[in-house]
Amino acid sequence: MTGKVTISEVSPRDGIQSITGDFVPTEVKIALIQALYDAGLRRMEIGSFVSPKAIPQMADTAAVLAFTKTLPGLESTVLVPNRRGFDAAIAGGAERLGFFMSATAGHNKANLNRTREESFAELASLVRDTPKGTLIRFNLSCVFHCPFDGVVEDAEALDWVERIVALNPDMEIALADTTGNASPDQVRRVFEKAHAAWGHRFAFHGHDTYGMGVANVAAAYEAGCRVIDSAAGGIGGCPVAPGASPS
């Protein structure tokens, strides 16, 4: 295990989606991505192919994706929640797809209006249908705590991880502290268990809601995690986890 860490910058997606009020112009999003690229970042979540009624700020993701394809060496990930988003992402030439669901029933229902089994069944079909050469990252929200269901037991979260792992031997899996409630001990323990069972294929997506973001990143690193999400300026958060701010 090397000490090298891959930073995945999520502010163009996680940050922008949280902005209410006026629509952030496409050129502003492009300028943000260009600035991050100029700063040396080479991996970013740049948008989501979701319903513009649900998340209006992501309505121009196709245009943003087209711009990112002009930046040499940039790994651009777009999030897709369902078949419609998947089809739009593939049509737009996406080379990295981010699938997502929640480890808890309450958050999955609030965020996706589906049961976990319904989400998993559709995402499993999307994993199977992903074109060869297209990379996948599977994001599991609320691994540690849920705004609706409270503290998540390790076993519940890891049961879902086990099912996700079985879908594809190569895809990266992100374990998310969606609300920022996790403790370093909890993060370290879950990552140690995941790595012991399925190898070092996991990323950490944390939030700094209660000032524990950096400590939790350190705990994930100590447990062997080498892919960490960041958000420039600490902007962003989940629409159904009020107050959560990225680390």
Where are the predicted features?
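Active-site mouth loops of central-metabolism enzymes
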Residues: S8-I30, L74-R83, N108-T115, V143-E156, ...
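Alpha-helix-loop-beta-strand connector modules within alpha/beta enzyme cores
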Residues: A54-V78, E118-I136, L158-I164, Q186-F204, ...
